């Protein structure tokens, strides 16, 4: 899942902004106590799948977390993200792909708290929900209201989601659906422009956003399956030990 997150620019930008907020909080802190720093960095430091809670158990052995190392990696990730944005804006796909590999390697080495991890996944889900919403509105206007056959819609709309002239050939076709499409052209194009904004924000095509979402779903399924298998294995071990006694 973390590998999928590293391929979605809005996630990387969110981490940048989160880190910037952390830096601002630290700058305002008069007392640079190590415990307080750990609390602030809890987004990026956890032990045994639990966010570190400072002084939550006075009898527990203190967990050593290298705040400097965490900050170093996040700074590195931020620089790499800025570099990626620049390459994407310059439309340099080859160098951008190489930069994505570096980002993936860095992010895979950053330990993220479960709470932040869920939040990062939600960013991808939110983008996908927006894609579904605008595509549904376009489909409602084109297929349900105008009567363009669903097969034809799917065949030509996929890959042309943000091509604003896509609907024109069906308006010019002088079919039963043409006049209704012409009446609703402004609404159709408006939704296509909303889809285009999602592409601009993510530096991905609509199909690219869908692919990231598919990868995320597959990753979550694999993670859930692995957890289930671990629980079942532990249960079998407990039963095996119990039988001996």
Where are these regions (language model features)?
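Transcription initiation cofactors for RNA polymerase, centered on bacterial
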Residues: 1-245
């Amino acid at each position: 899942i973390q590998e999928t997150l590293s391929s979605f620019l809005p996630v990387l930008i969110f981490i940048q902004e989160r880190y910037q907020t952390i830096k601002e909080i630290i700058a305002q802190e008069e007392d640079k106590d190590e415990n307080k720093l750990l609390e602030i960095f809890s987004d990026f430091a956890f032990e045994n799948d639990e966010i570190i809670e400072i002084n939550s158990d006075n009898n527990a052995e203190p967990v050593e977390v290298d705040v400097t190392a965490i900050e170093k990696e996040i700074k590195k990730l931020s620089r790499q993200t800025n570099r990626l944005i620049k390459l994407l804006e310059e439309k340099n796909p080859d160098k951008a792909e190489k930069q994505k590999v570096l980002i993936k390697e860095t992010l895979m080495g950053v330990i993220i708290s479960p709470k932040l991890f869920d939040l990062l996944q939600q960013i991808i889900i939110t983008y996908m929900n927006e894609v579904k919403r605008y595509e549904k509105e376009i489909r409602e206007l084109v297929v349900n209201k105008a009567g363009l056959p669903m097969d034809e819609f799917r065949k030509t709309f996929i890959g042309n989601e943000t091509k604003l002239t896509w609907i024109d050939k069906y308006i010019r076709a002088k079919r039963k659906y043409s006049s209704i499409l012409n009446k609703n052209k402004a609404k159709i194009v408006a939704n296509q422009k909303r889809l285009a904004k999602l592409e601009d924000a993510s530096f991905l095509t609509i199909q690219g956003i869908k692919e990231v979402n598919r990868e995320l779903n597959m990753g979550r399924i694999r993670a859930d399956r692995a957890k289930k298998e671990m629980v079942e294995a532990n249960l079998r071990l407990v039963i095996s030990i119990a039988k001996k006694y």
